[in-house]
Amino acid sequence: MTKKFLSIVMAGFFSFTAIADEGMWLPQLLQAMNESDMQAHGLQLTAEDLYSVNNSSMKDAIVSLGGFCTAEMISSEGLMLTNHHCAFGSIQEHSSVSNDYLKDGFWAMSRDEELPNEGLTASFLVSIEDVTARVVAEINPDMTEQERRVKIREISKTIVDEATEGTHYNARVKSFFGGNDFYIMKYETFKDVRLVGAPPSSIGKFGGDTDNWMWPRHTGDFALYRIYCAPDGTPAEYSVENVAYQPKHHLPIQLNGVENGDYTMIFGFPGSTDRYLTSFGVQQALDITSPTTVDIRTEKLAIMKAGMDANKRTKIQYAAKYAQTSNYWKYFIGQSKGLKSMKVHDKKIAIEDDF
């Protein structure tokens, strides 16, 4: 999981044929770029149903959990669904040798039993605005890379301050497409997020590192939280006086399953992509970055495992750290294999030569 404040995107998988028509788009661009194609492939919603600044839309049910995961609102009473691996840190924080929720799972039988999680946030996207012209106007080709970065940070802070002045919102200017486009993302962030339930790790982490980053998966990778807010509906720190948040939109639960050819898509907060790396960047990843990362994490995992195997309390205390480390240890191993087998470096060179 990537610990960054994430940007919301939509990925579509149009599955009327065996070959998926795939892509990833910023939701505010759907109407101009993709709406008709998505509807032709079976989408029964409009772009306005998916993303609207002025009206309730699907974006209001999609949550950035802690800035490192995506979650979804599934009830009008603040209930939020996410992955077990996204809640793993919370589950660990509440576990002890005598009360091991990692091993046994946890289920709150009432609202009073739901567990608060200090520092965990749930952020809803309010709006996205293109600020490319304003940022680009402040930089020029004669700047060094360091000067460019400093100037972008300065103008981004000004844009954010102006956008959030007099509100309880927070915002961030993010770059896209290799630093060619800039958008400001405005969020409403809630700070009282309580753990409602999670299965035992034998279900939530079934398959462990062996199955991680693989397909198909057979893991019950889910957990439930509930968002709380002040009585007036605004974000508030944890308090017994807080009430369950009533989202502008929540996703209905469909129990009938899916059929072959159904339209499917993902709406959420991904991490980052290296898709626009040059051939030199790919070569660096293959020769230096990935193998070094794998080697360091291999040693780190071995050190942690030795201590965890020797003491149950230590095993619980380091469970989340170990999972986070092994997650991208496995990722970089697979990424290197994929880059080599797909001959990505050679393809990048061909693209650059053609350009």
Predicted feature residues:
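Terminal presequence/propeptide segments associated with secretion/organelle targeting
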Residues: 2, 9, 16-355
